Regions:
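Sensory/regulatory domains in signal-transduction proteins
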Residues: 20, 27-121
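PAS-family sensory modules
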Residues: 1-24, 98-136
């Protein structure tokens, strides 16, 4: 069995399992965004703090704040319509020059999914938010 240091995902596997991820560089710019998140986010500024506010915990929406919060739960909200709440965790990359935010929409009602134009195929297979679609 491989050691934990050898576990990894291909780019395609990562994109499929985390379609709402964000990569934020040390300059605060959003470098990459998962396909599902990119589809529901309107065009806008490249800066993380310009596009999102951090709801929980109370912190500045910048790289330093994200790096200090590594591995812990956070909740974000987009600053533009449609307003999207996302929850997930921050993973500081080994080189320290970027952080991955592994996110999923914070869905509390099926209407939230419908309002964003999302479907089952927009979520990672492991994402429990999809269960709401089946509960209604």
């Amino acid at each position: 069995m491989p050691s934990s240091a050898e576990i990894g995902l291909t780019a395609a596997q990562f994109e499929a399992e985390f379609p709402f991820y964000l990569q934020v560089g040390c300059d605060g710019a959003i470098g990459r965004m998962g396909a599902s998140l990119a589809r529901i986010m309107p065009p806008g500024p490249a800066g993380f703090g310009e596009r999102f506010r951090v709801i929980r915990p109370e912190m500045t929406a910048d790289f330093a704040g994200l790096a200090a919060w590594g591995g812990k739960l956070l909740v974000l909200e987009s600053r533009f319509e449609p307003v999207v709440r996302l929850r997930g965790s921050v993973q500081l990359q080994p080189d320290g020059r970027s952080a991955l935010l592994l996110l999923s929409p914070w869905i509390t009602r099926v209407e939230d999914i419908e309002a964003l134009g999302l479907s089952i195929g927009d979520f990672g297979a492991h994402d429990p938010a999809v269960d709401l679609l089946f509960l209604q």
